[in-house]
Amino acid sequence: MKHNFLKSLTIPALAAIFFATGCTKKIDDAFANPNAQTKQPVEQLLPGIISNMAIQHSANGTLYGPQNDGLYFGRYVQFWATNGTGNQYDQMGDNFINRSDVLGSIWAMHYYGMGANISRIIEWGTEEKKWDYVGVAQAVRAWGWMTLTDVHDDVILREAFRPEQLVFKYDPQPDVYEEVKRLCHAALANLSKTGDGVNPANLAISDRYGNGGDINKWKRFTYGVLARTFNRVTNKSIYQPDSVIFYANLAMQNNSENTTITWSNTGGTGTYSFWSPFRGNIGALRQSKFIADLMSGLNGQFPTGNVDPRAPYIIRENPNGTYKGIRPNKGSDLLTSVNDRPDNFWGDAFSITAAPGSDNAARYIFKNAPIFPIMTAAEIQFLKAEAMLRKGDKAGALTAYKKGIELNFQELRTNYEVSVPAARRMTDAQRDAYLNNSLVVPAAADLTLSHIMMQKYISMYGWGVTEVWVDMRRYHYTDLDPTTGQQVYRDFAPPTGIDLYTNNLGKWIYRVRPRYNSEYLYNVDELNRLGAFAPDYITKECWFSKP
């Protein structure tokens, strides 16, 4: 949590001066408190809240949001790896030994970047009967709670957003998920209201870089949050596939209803994506062998022997024109020929880590101001397919599965094709051949969890890093598909032995620690209660993935 320790120091000091001098004028009248709450138009608060759903840059050091943490989570799920060896994140580690705030960006996003501003929109928007703003704020807070607990497990819930407190009690994950559901239903009720201060044109201005003020899209997003939340507990007896399916059917059904973020691209640092050449934050990252093999028809789940038509849209070819990648903590050990090493995500050679002067050669979500998905119709179809398969409805699962792939193809062609060289753009014939390949889209009786989860992984490559990490932890990285006896994530090889972070004590990562520079400095008793000072705390499994 953000702690107002300066306030606790300055107020007693000012009071002492007041009484010592015998001044009779009230301090509040004499010295306007620059930190005092003043009412601001809710229209001015919403843009910053929405930007936090990707990355927030409000001042030096305030790089809060999923894009920042995603640089590291992406190593855990092997979207990418560092182009060298010895990186603790490639080894499924953290940076606690250096008292670092790395992996604390979602924590800061929720409690600081969004925090009080969402509370004020809900309070002031209610006073002004701007139910559309209230509903959006509640929907984003629900998403924030879900995202926060997904990566940290126990978090501060009941005592959150209390500026008078310096220390806070933590609450268990089931309570947080219940709050997510409560907020979603409250959001839907407010988003359904009309009249009073509701003004779609007014909302569209504040929501310019998000859903554009489209209430239907915000409702679809909120239903998607509910579908995600109900699908978290697939390993438990309380799992309800019908609830996942119900909310998935109310969430986005086509790509025009996707929730996405974009940037103004106008010159200031905060007007560009955190993963862009302008920001220069991903110069050392290279696509993994896992994704490259998956997109090259070399993965055991989809052994087509042919390149997936989506490959040039989401990953990079090498000088030989093929798709290869690197293994965690191994650098380019298997790619002895320079011509086998993939270009970086900005289109320069493997060896180059400096950002280029423009994003002309960048593609997909790695451009300066890309369309950056937060939730898509394709993801929702894969959620639905998994729930239907678990329920035993294989025909329904196959329909949703195929639709998810089709939606992903459409999304890539609509939003990202302009950056793909003409010679590498997919044709309708290539798309149809892929979808008609029984190795990819089998008969209903042959559909497996591996089919669904691996295609979901492809459809969320890059942007969906936090959600994919949830999925991989639900399947404990290497759980077996009950139908095939093979790993659900076929050929996925988490680091082991010397490639696994020493402090993990031989175990894989399942959570990240609370943000260091608030919790480990001020909330020591609570963290001791949770065991969060243990070197291997990050290997402690979250509640959602346990039986």
Say what each PLM segment does.
Residues 23-81, 109, 360, 476-547:
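Membrane-proximal, proline-rich intrinsically disordered regions
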Residues 40-43, 82-416, 442-450, 455:
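Structured, solvent-exposed acidic/aromatic patches
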Residues 402-486:
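Active-site/pore-lining binding-face segments in mid-to-C-terminal subdomains
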Residues 1-32:
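Bacterial Sec-dependent N-terminal signal peptides
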Residues 75, 198-217, 268-273, 423-428, ...:
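Amphipathic alpha-helical surface "interface" segments used
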Residues 18, 58-59, 414, 461:
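Intrinsically disordered or highly flexible coil/loop and linker segments, enriched in small
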